[in-house]
Amino acid sequence: MLGVTNTTRSLREFWCTELPDHIVGLAFRPDAGLFAAASVTGPIHVLSATDGAPHALFAGHGFGTSGISWSADGTLLASIGQDGVVKAWDVARKDMAWSGEATAPWAERAAWSADGTLLAVAAGKLVRLWNRQGQLLRTFGPHSSTVLDIAWKPQSRQLAATSYGCVTLWDADQPEPVRTYRWQGSSLVLAWSPDGRYLATGDQDATVHFWITKTGRDYQMSGYPRKVKELSWDGSSRWLATGGGSQACVWDCSPPGPNDREPLILEAHDRSLTTLAFQHRRELLATGGAEGRVMIWRPSRGRGAVSASEEGPAITQLAWSPDDQVLAAGDEAGRVRLFRVLK
């Protein structure tokens, strides 16, 4: 097995539950007591993070759920789907708090602001903002093409949105863009560094684009076997992990930037790497593959995996608990497993 050495430990789950279908979303509540799992057919399960006991079951979206996001205080769980509707679920009452139209046949992304007061939703060429009470506050766009991803700048009211040829930066309190980062290509995903200094995109043309946000200076990293749909920053904002093949490429983005540096290549999976996620504040990187294996890495100390699970159905989602001690993994068969990863 690639990446596995004689020091690689077995990664063992402390509980597992089986849901009806392919997992498309996993998210821990900010207090880590509950987490939500969304399936491709629509239902959203809210489970105890301790033992997997059911807490609530929400209907989700009739044509399938495409994304979920917790508010900062953990009271509301937002969901979007192929029905073009955004919904906010009251987790304590176990009922829907409100819903709104996303203005397109399907919604691509939903994300709460860091303070939990604003919910952003991307649908078609528009991005819309709602408050916690379900009041529509603002509509951004139309953009140059379908907005495939959005992300709030850390600890800020600024929101980045991808469309063909650019990343557009909006301020929640202004009707016009704050800044536009241009390049000729189509970005599929974007990720802010935790300190807000850098913005990275994974792209349709099998590249990664990287901006220093203050100056607008940009870099492009190429050579990936396929389009790049997996990005994750470590908590220090130094390391950017990327997919785009069977390997994980980890770039050193400390000043002056990743240009002219060779990435650390982690020989991660026998088949395609499907998802990856750094811990929030620590140094461990989790990867999941099409062969069903979950692997844990410490890139700062070399190329060998720290621990690895057994193979199974393809991994579709990974999520770290807020305290970085538990890793959740969802797969294409509907299985959700939790692993305890202390250090």
Segments from the language model and where they lie:
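WD40-repeat beta-propeller superdomains and closely related acidic/aromatic-rich repeat-like regions
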Residues: M1-K343
